[in-house]
Amino acid sequence: MTALSALIEQKLQSLGTILCQSFPELSPEKIHEAIQQNSNHPELPVYQLGYAIAMSDFVEKVLQKYPHLVKQWWEKSPCFADCTAYIERLNKELANVHDETALYQTLRQFRNIEMAKLSFCQSLNLATVEEIFVQLSQLAESLIIAARDWLYHQACAEIGTPMDEQGNPQQLYILGMGKLGGFELNFSSDIDLIFTYPSQGETSVENTNARRSVDNGKFFTRLGQRLISALDEFTSDGFVYRTDMRLRPFGDSGVLVLSFSAMEQYYQDQGRDWERYAMIKGRVLGAQTKDPNVSKLKKMLRPFVYRRYIDFSVIQSLREMKGKIEREVRRRGLKDNIKLGAGGIREVEFIVQVFQLIRGGREINLQQHSLLKILPEITKLRLITEQQFHDLRESYIFLRRVENILQAINDQQTQTLPTDEIDQIRLVEACKTFTCLNENNQTIEKHYPIENWDDFYRTLQQKQEKVRAVFTQLIGDEQDESSQTDSQWQDFLEADFEDIEQTLLESSVSENNIDEVLEKLAQFKDGLNHRVIGSRGRDVLSHLMPTVLALIFEQENYRTLLPRILNIIEKISSRTTYLELLLENPRALQQVIELCAQSQLISEQLAHYPILLDELLNTEALRHPLPFTQYPAELHQYLLRLPPDDEEQLIDALRQFKQATLLKVAAADILGALPVMKVSDHLTYLAEAIIEVVVNLAWKQVSSRFGVPEHLQNNEKGFLVIGYGKLGGIELGYKSDLDLVFLYDAVESQTTGGKKVIDSNQFYLRLAQKIVSIFSINTSAGVLYEADMRLRPSGDAGLIGCSLSAFSHYQLNDAWTWEKQALVRARPVFGESSLKAKFEHIRQQVLSASRDIEQLKQDVVEMRKKMFAHLSHSKHSEFNLKTDRGGITDIEFIAQYLMLANAPKKPQLTKWSDNVRIFDDMAEAKIISQTDCDTLKQCYVDLRNTIHHLNLLGKSSVVEDSEFVKERSFIQAFWDRLFVS
C-alpha cells in the first residue's frame, strides 16, 4: 500500500461517525466494508471522496462541519458543472436573509462549500488549472457583489438612497485588483479592492425611517465599512475573504470611497508607477454591459495605465519593484517561495506587465486583464520569442498548480514549499499528472516524471530557471557585474598568524599598529569559529574577505574602521544571503566601507539590522535622497506588502522603514548631499509620516473594539498630535526623542457606536495609550521612537490626552512660564486641518497674551539655571554643545523669550515654531538687528551640524573647550544684553 493509499483509507475512516449518521440503515461494519471494497476504484464516489480529503485537510473540515455533504458526495461525486451560477444561487439564498448575522453566516457557508467543491475538482483533475482559478475568481466576485447588493438595500432603507444631482440613484462600484481582477485568484488569496461612486449628492429619505439626508460620501463610506466587515470578519463559520483596501488612492490615509472625479484627479496628479502596474488588473466587479458608469470608469482609468506613446520608463520602475521584492525575500528569510523567489510567479507577471505598460497604449490587444491571454499577444508582436513564450506559459501553469494545491491543503495563504512529509506527498501526487489548456485552448493531460519529492523539486527548479532566464534577458537586474579581484588577503581565513603578520608588514599598515590589528583579526577569526556557518557560507566568506580587508587597509583611519567592519561581517556570517549580497555587489561593499569609515552610528545600525545592507545597493539614490515630502507615499507603499491586520508585522515594518530611511539620510549627510537644515527636515518629516501610520494603526485597533465617537463625520478622527521640542521646531537629530501632546475634539456626553460602547473621552485616552505603546514597544527591530509625554497639561500627573477646550483653559490660566516657552516650539503634526487651525488659534492666543516682562525675564533665567544645574556635567576642559553656557539651549531660550516678550504687541510673530525663522521674523520686525539675526542663525546651524556628525560617529555632544570660542562668546554676550543689562 502506498503512502497515499494509506492516507485515503485513514481519512475515510475518520469520517465513519458522520457516515453512520448519514446512513442510519448501515452499521459501522458495513461502512468499513464499503470503504474497503471501493477505496481502490478511482472511478467510484467513495474513492474520490477519500482522495479529495486525503489531498486537503480543508475539505475534510468542511465535510465535518456540514455532514449533509458527506452523504451527497458518498453517493455522487461533485463535478465541475456544479461550480457555476454562483450569483443566481447566492441571491436566492439571500432573499430569505433579514439581518447581518444571517448574512454573515450565509456568505461563509456558501463560500466554504463551494471552495470545497473546487478543491475536490482540482484534486481529481475534473477541471484544468486555468478553469480552477477562473472559477475561484467568479466565486469571489459573486460573493462580493451579492453582499454589496444586500447591504446596499439595507442601507437605503435605513438612511436613504444616494442620488446624483439629476435625481438618479447611485451604486457602489468595486474595482477588483490583482489576481481577482485578472480572473487568476489563488485558492486562499486576499482580495484587493477599491471602492468608488459616480458623483457627489445626497440621499433621498422618502419611504425611510431616516430623519435627514446624508451626503453620498458618508453613505458609501458606511456601506464600504459594512461590506468589508461582512467579507473579512472572522466568525464561528470562518471568513469570506481577507480584504485589503490599501491600493486605493492615499492608501490607509485616504478616504475609503472616492467619487469618480476625485479618483480621476488623484491618478492624474499623483498616480505613481506602481499604481499603474496595479491598475493593469483593475476590473469593475459585477459590471453590467449597458451600465454607462462602468464605461465612464474604464474610460477614465485607461489613460493613466496605458500611455499613447511607447513608454520605456517603466522598465526601471519595474526593475526597482523587483529589487524591493528580492530584498523582502531576504529580509523575511523566505526560502522556496514559488511566488516571490527567483523564477517565481511574480517574475512571469512582471515580464507580461512591463510590455503592457510599455506598449499597451498603442496595442489594444494588450489592454486585457488575464496574463495567459496577454502572453500570446506579446509573442505575436515579436516582443518575446516562441521559445520564451512556451517556457513562460508552461512554467506559469506549473507554478500556479503548485500554488493552488498548496493553499487548498488547509485554506491558508502560503507560497512556501512544505517541510511536512504528508504535504510533500500531496504536492508530488498533484503535480505528476494534471489537466490544463494547451495553446489552442484544448484540454490536455500534462505528465511530469515526478515520483518523489526530489523529482518534484528538480522539476520545479527547472521551471523557475526558465522563468529567471527570460526575466534576466528581458528586464535584467540591478547587480553590478564587476568581478572580484585577487588580493594579498586571498587565503586570510586559512592563513596562520605568522602569514597574516607578514601580509600586514607588506601592506600600508604602520609597524606601530601591527599588534593592535593582529589582535582584532584574531578576535574576528575566533568569533567566526563560534558561529554556525555552512559550507556555502564559508565559501562565500573566503571570497569576500580578501576584498573587504584590502578596502579597509586602503583607508587612512583603518584602525577605527577595521573593528566596525569586522563586527558587521561577524554578525552576518551565519546569514549567507547577506554575505552574497556584499560579494555580488562591489559598489554596495565600497559604500559600506566609505560610510562606516565616517560613522560609528551607521556601522552599529548595519551590525544590529543587516537588512539595512539592502539599502546600499542603489548607491546613486544615496547621493540623491528621496524628497522628504514623499515619505508618506513611500511608507504607504512599503507597508502594502504586509497583511493589513497583522499588527506585529506592521509594527516591525515601521521600525525597519525608519532604520532604512535614517541610514539613507545619514549616508547623504556624510556624502555631502544634504546640508544640516535639510538633514533635520528629512528626519522630522520621516517622523511625521510614521506618526500618521501609527495613529491610523492605533485608531483601527481601538475602533474595531469600541466603534468610533458618534459625533464624527465621514473620515474624521477628531484627534490631534502636537509635536513639541525638536519635532515641533523641525529640528530632529539622529537620536532625538519625540515630545508629543495628544489633543482631541470630543462632544460632551457622546459615546462610541461600536459593539462595546464607551464614553468619547475614554475612547481618545485609549487611543493615546495605544499610540504610545506602538512607539515604545521593544521588538526584535528595536524601539520606534522614545515618546516623551511630559509636556502635556499637568505633566506626568495629567491624563495622557486632553480635549482642545481643556488644553486652552490650562494654557491660558494654569500654565507655567516654562510651559509657554515649550509652546513656542509646538505645532500640529497630525490631524484634520480644521483642528490644526483651532490649535494654532489657541497657541497664538496664549503666546500673545499680555505679560510682565520683568517677571518673564526672571522666570526664563531661573529655568535656564535649573537646566544647567541638572543637565550640564562637562569638565572644565570640555564644552557641551547642548547644555553648557553659550550652547544650543541658550539659543533656544533666546528665541522663546523674544517671542513671549514681543508677541503681545505683534501676534504675527507667533507664526513659526523653529528657531531660524523666529530669528528672521524678529529681524524683520526690527526687534533684533539683521547682523545679530544672521550670527545667531549661523551659530545655531554650526552647533547643530557638529552634533549631527558627533551622533554619526557615535559620540556625545561634548567637545574640547577650545572649540566654538567665538560662537559661545557671542551667544553669552547676547544673553547678557537681554537678561542682565
Swiss-Prot record:
Keyword Nucleotidyltransferase: yes
Enzyme nomenclature, EC number: 2.7.7.89, 2.7.7.42
Gene Ontology CC, one term: cytosol
InterPro entries registered for this protein in UniProt: GlnE, GlnE_rpt_dom, NT_sf, PII_UdlTrfase/GS_AdlTrfase
Cofactor: Mg(2+)
Recorded GO MF terms: [glutamate-ammonia-ligase] adenylyltransferase activity; [glutamine synthetase]-adenylyl-L-tyrosine phosphorylase activity; ATP binding; magnesium ion binding
Region (Adenylyl transferase): 483-981
Entry keyword set: ATP-binding, Magnesium, Multifunctional enzyme, Nucleotide-binding, Nucleotidyltransferase, Transferase
Catalytic activity from the UniProt record: [glutamine synthetase]-O(4)-(5'-adenylyl)-L-tyrosine + phosphate = [glutamine synthetase]-L-tyrosine + ADP; [glutamine synthetase]-L-tyrosine + ATP = [glutamine synthetase]-O(4)-(5'-adenylyl)-L-tyrosine + diphosphate
Gene Ontology BP, a term: regulation of glutamine family amino acid metabolic process
Enzyme class name: transferase
Keyword Magnesium tagged: yes
Region (Adenylyl removase): 1-479
PANTHER family, alphabetized: BIFUNCTIONAL GLUTAMINE SYNTHETASE ADENYLYLTRANSFERASE_ADENYLYL-REMOVING ENZYME (PTHR30621:SF0), GLUTAMINE SYNTHETASE ADENYLYLTRANSFERASE (PTHR30621)
UniProt function note: Involved in the regulation of glutamine synthetase GlnA, a key enzyme in the process to assimilate ammonia. When cellular nitrogen levels are high, the C-terminal adenylyl transferase (AT) inactivates GlnA by covalent transfer of an adenylyl group from ATP to specific tyrosine residue of GlnA, thus reducing its activity. Conversely, when nitrogen levels are low, the N-terminal adenylyl removase (AR) activates GlnA by removing the adenylyl group by phosphorolysis, increasing its activity.
Record family assignment: Belongs to the GlnE family.
Protein's name in the database: Bifunctional glutamine synthetase adenylyltransferase/adenylyl-removing enzyme
Organism for this UniProt entry: Haemophilus influenzae (strain ATCC 51907 / DSM 11121 / KW20 / Rd)
Gene it is expressed from: glnE
